[in-house]
From Swiss-Prot:
Chain's gene name: pyrH
Keyword ATP-binding (UniProt): yes
Keywords: Allosteric enzyme, ATP-binding, Cytoplasm, Kinase, Nucleotide-binding, Pyrimidine biosynthesis, Transferase
Organism: Shewanella sp. (strain W3-18-1)
NCBIfam families xref list: pyrH_bact (TIGR02075)
Pathway(s) served: Pyrimidine metabolism; CTP biosynthesis via de novo pathway; UDP from UMP (UMPK route): step 1/1
Protein name (database record): Uridylate kinase
Activity regulation summary: Allosterically activated by GTP. Inhibited by UTP.
A biological process term (GO) from this entry: 'de novo' CTP biosynthetic process
Binding site residues for UMP: 57, 77, 138-145
Record function comment: Catalyzes the reversible phosphorylation of UMP to UDP.
Cellular compartments annotated: Cytoplasm
Similarity annotation: Belongs to the UMP kinase family.
Pfam families: AA_kinase
Length: 245
């Protein structure tokens, strides 16, 4: 087990699913989970890590069901984007209560609620030690929050996209359904495609691959896992270009 005293990454993009904020509830935001996540992000800031955050909106709104019932997909996606803003507001508030400087930037202008997304300003804020939360996805329908995470990660020149999920990495099969599923420690982009492993949607994954953006999948519900990932300890599954030997 590595005991590297220095963080492996300097600037990260943390992607959290909206569902991660629910805790054991079936809907909404569990305040205890929110506060724990804010404390874990605070630990990173205290280590000198520059942190960008993208949060999904699935705990507050799911457009698929309404789309099947006849709602226009664009309308549903706009509602989903607003759900991510609500989660972003909650996270910003939790960080402020933990005495962490944080700014919320939305891809959709919401005057008086949060800042408009501005790439140059986001970089400046990160460099000054502020956590920047990116809300409203990419601002476009038909784009997932995973796509937004990869896009923002590439834009801010993050060294890695950390995808916090409910399982502790990428498995050969669904570990919830198959007890014999094998966990991978490291995979290449091509292995993910060959094995048809579900990490994120293809558009997001292809964007990360084309820009050589590593993705690290880990369990955000596991206390201390985020810090262990940052410190380069054996946690989660790292996906990157295959190293030339």
């Amino acid at each position: 087990m590595s005991t590297n005293p220095k963080p492996t990454f300097r600037r990260i993009l943390l992607k959290l699913s909206g569902e991660a904020l629910m805790g054991d509830e079936g809907f909404g935001i569990d305040p205890k989970v929110l506060d724990r996540m804010a404390q874990e992000v605070k630990e990173l800031v205290e280590l000198g890590i520059q942190v960008g955050v993208v949060i999904g909106g699935g705990n507050l709104f799911r457009g698929e069901g309404l789309a099947k019932a006849g709602m226009n997909r664009v309308v549903g996606d706009h509602m989903g984007m607003l759900a991510t803003v609500m989660n972003g507001l909650a996270m910003r508030d939790a960080l402020h209560r933990a005495y962490v400087n944080a700014r919320l930037m939305s891809a959709i202008p919401l005057k008086g609620v949060c800042d408009d997304y501005n790439w140059a300003e986001a970089i400046s804020l990160l460099k000054s030690g502020r956590v920047v939360i990116f809300a409203a996805g990419t601002g476009n329908p038909f784009c997932t929050t995973d796509s937004a995470a990869c896009l923002r990660g590439i834009e801010i020149e993050a060294e890695v996209v950390l995808k916090g999920t409910k399982v502790d990495g990428v498995y050969s099969d669904d570990p919830m359904k198959n007890p014999d599923a094998v966990k991978y420690d490291e995979l290449s982009y091509s292995e993910i495609l060959e094995k048809e492993l579900k990490v994120m949607d293809l558009a997001a994954f292809t964007m990360a691959r084309d820009h050589d953006m590593p993705i690290l999948v880990f369990n955000m519900n596991k206390p201390g896992a985020l810090r262990r990932v940052i410190m380069g300890e054996e946690e989660g599954t790292l996906i990157r270009a295959k190293k030339v030997i």
